[in-house]
Each structure stands twice: as C-alpha cells, then as structure tokens.
C-alpha cells in the first residue's frame, strides 16, 4: 500500500511539469520571436553601417586621389617655376648679346687699331654666352637649316640658286631658347630656291 500512496503523488507532479513545459514553450516562442525581431533590426543596422563604411571608403579614395593630384600639380608648378624663373632676366640679356654681335660684325679683326677691342668684345660675349648657357639658355642659329615657323621668323624670301628652297639663307638676328621654350625666334631670310628667270 505504501506503493499506491506514492503513485498518486507522482501524477500531479508530472502534470505540473507538463504545464511548466507548456508555459516555458510559449515563453520560448515569445522570446524567439523577439530575438528574431532584434536580429532583423541588428541585420538592418549592420547593412546600413556597411553601406556607410563603403561610402566612407569611396570618399577616402577620392580624397586620396585629389591629394595626389594636388601634389602632382604643385610639383609641376614648382618645376616650371624653377625651370623658367630666369625667363624675364634672360629676355633682358638678349639685346646685350645682339649689341655685342653687332659690335663684332662692325669691327675689323685684322685692323691693328681695333684688334684689341674686337678681342675684348669677343671674349666678353663668349663669357656671357657660356654663363647664360649654364642656366638653360640656348642660341638658335638656323643658318642653312630648313625654315621652321615655330622657331624662325621670316623677314622675307629671295631667290638663291646656292641654297635649297625653304632653307634659311641669312640670319638677321639669332633666336634663343630657355630649357626648350622659345624666348625669341630667329629673324631670317628664306631662300626661294633657283634664280629668277630674266629671259621671260
């Protein structure tokens, strides 16, 4: 009998456990629903954050590219400034060189009275030309070369059977370049080629 008395007490206990399980199941379903809702919210927040990160990465890449472009432009500007800083000064020296050439052309190197002056002007001019060449100034002396309108300024054309057509036959004034940039074109006379037909 003692076994029978124990059995009735166990049945209500099992019923209570079933009730707790059912109650716990409903609570779990509720918790799972809330957890799923929270997971969806977090996934949306994560997607928004990832989109923002991609946007920021794009902005950073663009900013870095802009900084590189600015650096390149600044470096090019500095290089140009260094390369052509002497342009104005060199342009001021060109008439001095022209006058020295005229002085040499107008002086007879063989005449004893003017020989010393000729040598002095010649050495001074040579020294000045060497000095400006050190800073990138280059003489453009196109005698006998084909006419180039980018570097030469034609004063006129004359027939000359000894010089091919469209070639420089006389340099009236030399031109000058500074680091490849034309400071002043050479003033030249250009050959038309063969002589003038006088029998016509």
UniProtKB/Swiss-Prot annotation:
Q: What species is this protein from? A: Shewanella amazonensis (strain ATCC BAA-1098 / SB2B)
Entry's family note: Belongs to the GrpE family.
Any GO CC annotation of this UniProt entry: cytosol
Which UniProt keywords are present, listed alphabetically? Chaperone, Cytoplasm, Stress response
Query: What name has this protein been given in UniProt?
Result: Protein GrpE
Q: Does the keyword Cytoplasm apply?
A: yes
Tell me which SUPFAM superfamilies the record gives: Coiled-coil domain of nucleotide exchange factor GrpE (SSF58014), Head domain of nucleotide exchange factor GrpE (SSF51064)
Note the Pfam families from the entry.
GrpE
Describe the protein's quaternary organization and the partners it interacts with. Homodimer.
Enumerate the CDD domains for this protein: GrpE
What is the annotated role of this protein in its UniProt record?
Answer: Participates actively in the response to hyperosmotic and heat shock by preventing the aggregation of stress-denatured proteins, in association with DnaK and GrpE. It is the nucleotide exchange factor for DnaK and may function as a thermosensor. Unfolded proteins bind initially to DnaJ; upon interaction with the DnaJ-bound protein, DnaK hydrolyzes its bound ATP, resulting in the formation of a stable complex. GrpE releases ADP from DnaK; ATP binding to DnaK triggers the release of the substrate protein, thus completing the reaction cycle.
InterPro entries on file? GrpE, GrpE_coiled_coil, GrpE_head
Location within or outside the cell: Cytoplasm
Q: Which GO terms describe its biological process?
A: protein folding
Signal peptide annotation: none
Q: Name one GO molecular function term.
A: unfolded protein binding
Q: Does the keyword Cytoplasm apply?
A: yes
- Which domain of life does the protein's organism represent? Bacteria
């Amino acid at each position: 009998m003692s076994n029978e008395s124990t059995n009735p007490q166990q049945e209500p206990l099992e019923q209570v456990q079933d009730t707790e399980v059912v109650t716990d199941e409903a609570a779990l379903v509720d918790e799972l629903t809330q957890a799923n809702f929270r997971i969806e919210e977090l996934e949306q927040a994560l997607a928004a954050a990832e989109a923002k990160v991609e946007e920021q990465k794009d902005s950073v890449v663009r900013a870095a590219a802009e900084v590189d472009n600015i650096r390149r432009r600044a470096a090019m500007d500095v290089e140009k400034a260094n390369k052509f800083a002497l342009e104005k000064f060199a342009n001021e020296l060109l008439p001095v060189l022209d006058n020295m050439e005229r002085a040499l052309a107008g002086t007879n190197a063989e005449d004893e009275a003017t020989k010393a002056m000729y040598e002095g002007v010649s050495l001074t001019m040579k020294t000045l030309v060497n000095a400006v060449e050190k800073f990138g100034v280059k003489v453009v002396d196109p005698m006998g070369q084909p006419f180039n309108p980018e570097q030469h300024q034609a004063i006129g054309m004359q027939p000359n059977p000894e010089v091919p057509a469209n070639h420089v036959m006389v340099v009236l004034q030399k031109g000058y370049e500074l680091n490849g940039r034309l400071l002043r074109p050479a003033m030249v006379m250009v050959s038309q080629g063969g002589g003038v037909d006088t029998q016509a």
